[in-house]
């Protein structure tokens, strides 16, 4: 397979299913990436959020070829983080599909959710944070995250949002993203993943000074203890930060 972004997009665009429903969270499109055995849970959570969305049937390892892995990752190279971990590239490409689809369709602001999510603070807090995010210059909102140093001198940019630009944070289970970022991210790098998807994203944001915010408290968590992991991440999710007192 020729390693081109449009080629990958055309190959897997049939994995999208457009679902209409009432309501909305204030973005041009919401995406939910789901494995087949989690679609029921994913649809339930998307119904709680409200609004039209695109369900993306996650790319699986059996849908990729040896050439895919060799030309788009370091899966076959000993000593690297992704060595012999065949679930990592499919995850990255599933997110790529959502990014690329947003560009193709001209969406200005999107949100992407994974299929094992929960909303511990309720949907109204999510909507409020998204509304504030759309009115600031920052380009990336992590509604949920992990491995963020909670004591690094962050600053408040709005009632619900904290500026964490330039810091290292991972876990991509709930993102809101502006088109300006997607353009930089896709045009600024080849379709190649030397690390796990969330590590590649975090490094890109830090190196390119992408304005990044998180909410006062995590608004979207992963139900890893209850649902497990289908991506080899079997450790329980670490605690997130509470920035209400900043």
PLM regions: where:
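An acidic/histidine-cluster motif and surrounding catalytic segment
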Residues: 2-113, 117-246
